[in-house]
Amino acid sequence: MSYSLGITLTFELLKFKTEYVNRVYVHSAMKQGDTLDKLLKLCKDSDIEVVYVDKIFNVLSQKENCYVIGEFRKFESKLDKESSHIVLVNPSNAGNMGTIMRSALGFGMNRMAIIRPAVDAFDPKVVRASMGAIFSTEFVYFDSFDEYMKEYGDRELYPFMLDAKMKLHDVSPRDKFSLIFGNEATGLPHEFSNIGQSVIIPHSARIDSLNLPIAASIAMYEATKADF
């Protein structure tokens, strides 16, 4: 079970994953008006229960202006073998994962492989940070990178590493590809330098590295800019 915290996220949930919605909670402080009327109509049309209760908001949300919560069942996805992927190896931060999902949807790369151990994509913090992009993202968990490779390895592979020799602006993916990123704290293990073509995003010496969502977003932009 998971939750969409806030009316904007809940509208996205109702739009893209209606069949997985159990119920919608509405706080007593939610103002009457067109927005609430629209929400109630969507729920009625899809036969979704609306529950007026305040207590659950105290448990699930620390934001004072959260007046709508959608409760939904976890859903399964499949990765398209003919599409390009984002691969996150051992991501541990919920906010980062959600932010990457949002960028991936924006750049048309909303297919994500997640290598365990990893944060739960259905953590409400991921859902919130994704701004609803999770409901339009294909994502699959794998117990190891080798498991991912066995099923989806027939593609161009680009692990992003600080000791890589090739700079991002010199990379020109020609076919389906995977952009591979490591854990926020440790990056990718050294053995990934032997997989595909390792890549570095050049930046000034004033910083040690870019944070994960920024690096992933820059990489996705460069890889897909010809499409827009």
What residues fall within each predicted segment?
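Amphipathic alpha-helical repeat scaffolds
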Residues: G6, S92-I100, L210-A215
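Active-site/ligand-binding-proximal alpha/beta "capping" segment
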Residues: F160-D208
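Short, glycine/polar-rich helix-capping loops at beta-to-alpha or helix-loop-helix junctions
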Residues: L36-L39, V119-V126, T186-E191
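N-terminal positively charged helical leader segments and presequences
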Residues: M1-I69
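RNA substrate-binding interface of SAM-dependent RNA methyltransferases
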Residues: N22, V26, E76-A164
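Structured adenosyl-cofactor binding patch, chiefly the S-adenosyl-L-methionine
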Residues: N22, G70, L105-F107, A121-F135, ...
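Short beta->alpha connector loops at strand-helix junctions that form conserved
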Residues: V53-D54, V89, I115-R116, E138, ...
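Short, structured interface segments
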Residues: Y67-S77
